[in-house]
């Protein structure tokens, strides 16, 4: 029983000591964290601009947009036709009771 009490006491002291050490540890300054974040974002932006200047990326973007346009054009035309058919059917249903 004494051994169990001693183990619990030792565990409590160790956990309190760990909490005390954590409180004494110096926390990073908020201003330095923010400035580091902005510096990282600035560097990333500069790298991105340098990559975007290259003709390879512009050619890839142009090819992507052309491919997307080729794929979407038939879908948009079909959706427009379906919408017009739907609305015309809806309008026909409304005009039928009035003519009878």
From Swiss-Prot:
It is found in: Secreted. PANTHER family: APOLIPOPROTEIN A-II. It holds the Pfam family ApoA-II. Monomer. Interacts with NAXE and NDRG1. InterPro entries: ApoA-II, ApoA-II_sf. This is Apolipoprotein A-II. Transmembrane segments: none annotated. GO terms for biological process: cholesterol homeostasis; cholesterol transport; lipoprotein metabolic process; positive regulation of phagocytosis; protein stabilization. GO terms for molecular function: cholesterol transfer activity; high-density lipoprotein particle binding; lipid binding.
């Amino acid at each position: 029983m004494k051994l169990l009490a001693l183990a619990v006491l030792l565990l409590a002291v160790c956990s309190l000591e760990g909490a005390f050490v954590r409180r004494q540890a110096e926390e990073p300054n908020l201003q330095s964290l923010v400035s580091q974040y902005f510096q990282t974002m600035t560097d990333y932006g500069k790298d991105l601009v340098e990559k975007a200047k290259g003709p390879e990326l512009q050619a890839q973007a142009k090819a992507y947009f052309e491919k997307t346009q080729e794929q979407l054009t038939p879908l948009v035309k079909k959706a427009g036709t379906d919408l017009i058919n739907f609305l015309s059917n809806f309008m026909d249903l409304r005009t039928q009771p009035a003519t009878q």
